[in-house]
């Protein structure tokens, strides 16, 4: 989604 949290 932004970083490596939820794509």
UniProtKB/Swiss-Prot annotation:
This protein's UniProt keywords: Amidation, Amphibian defense peptide, D-amino acid, Endorphin, Opioid peptide, Secreted
A Gene Ontology BP annotation from the UniProt entry: defense response
Subcellular location: Secreted
Positions where D-methionine occurs in the chain: 2
Residues found modified as Aspartic acid 1-amide: 7
A cellular component annotation (GO) from this entry: extracellular region
Coiled-coil spans in chain: none
Chief localization: secreted
Family listed: Belongs to the frog skin active peptide (FSAP) family. Dermorphin subfamily.
Protein name as annotated: [D-Met2]-deltorphin
């Amino acid at each position: 989604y932004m970083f490596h949290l939820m794509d």
